[in-house]
Amino acid sequence: MSVKGVEMPEMTWDLDVGNKWRRRKALSRIHRFWECRLRVWWLSDAGVRETDPPRPRRRPTWMTAVFHVICAVLLTLMIMAIGALIAYLRYYHQDSWRDMLHDLFCGCHYPEKCRRHHERQRRRRRAMDVPDPELGDPARRPLNGAMYYGSGCRFDTVEMVDETRPAPPALSSPETGDDSNDDAVAGGGAGGVTSPATRTTSPNALLPEWMDAVHVAVQAAVQATVQVSGPRENAVSPAT
């Protein structure tokens, strides 16, 4: 390319952009500004070839395959751990798992002062002016939030039985004087088999150690899967 008999190098793309802008009529200030920015920001094809030459495509090696397998295993374990934690909190702390998370992350451990503070907050939130005696003894009040906010789980009424502990003796009702439960407990103690209707356990007895938490969570997840996949007529009603 020659201009007035003088050999000039071939015009690159960024300079050609400026030449095209120059051919426009009545360029505004913003057009001139963007013309300048185009020259500064956008390299020509020759400049790109000089600064970033094409490299050959690297073929995956066995190290890449091992790395992908390790990443997949770690991701699977992380998802399983999150699911096990949710199952553990949901089925062993049915309504108190929110309080347990608060206990873990806030360090409150629910002393009497903190518990009453939460009760006052809930009462203010619900616009209720209920005196403390009507709520009952705070020391005997359960830590779960069933009395404050409902739960959406349809298996809240499922009784979790601890098979590793002996069942406590059932007391006869003082109104009717019915001792049928005592006979069932006595028969179960003599024969080594306890009736499922008389097996009761406290929520604190179902707290495993941290080493056994994963095993217990897997058992709870399997039990929940069996309950969900069972027939509809045998499903537990929340009203029972």
Swiss-Prot record:
<keyword id="KW-1133">Transmembrane helix</keyword>
<feature type="region of interest" description="Disordered">
    <location>
        <begin position="119"/>
        <end position="142"/>
    </location>
</feature>
<protein>
    <recommendedName>
        <fullName>Protein UL136</fullName>
    </recommendedName>
</protein>
<keyword id="KW-0812">Transmembrane</keyword>
<keyword id="KW-1043">Host membrane</keyword>
<keyword id="KW-0945">Host-virus interaction</keyword>
<feature type="transmembrane region" description="Helical">
    <location>
        <begin position="69"/>
        <end position="89"/>
    </location>
</feature>
<comment type="subunit">
    <text>Interacts with host ATP1B1.</text>
</comment>
<dbReference type="GO" id="GO:0016020">
    <property type="term" value="C:membrane"/>
</dbReference>
<feature type="region of interest" description="Disordered">
    <location>
        <begin position="164"/>
        <end position="199"/>
    </location>
</feature>
<comment type="similarity">
    <text>Belongs to the HHV-5 UL136 protein family.</text>
</comment>
<keyword id="KW-0472">Membrane</keyword>
<dbReference type="GO" id="GO:0033644">
    <property type="term" value="C:host cell membrane"/>
</dbReference>
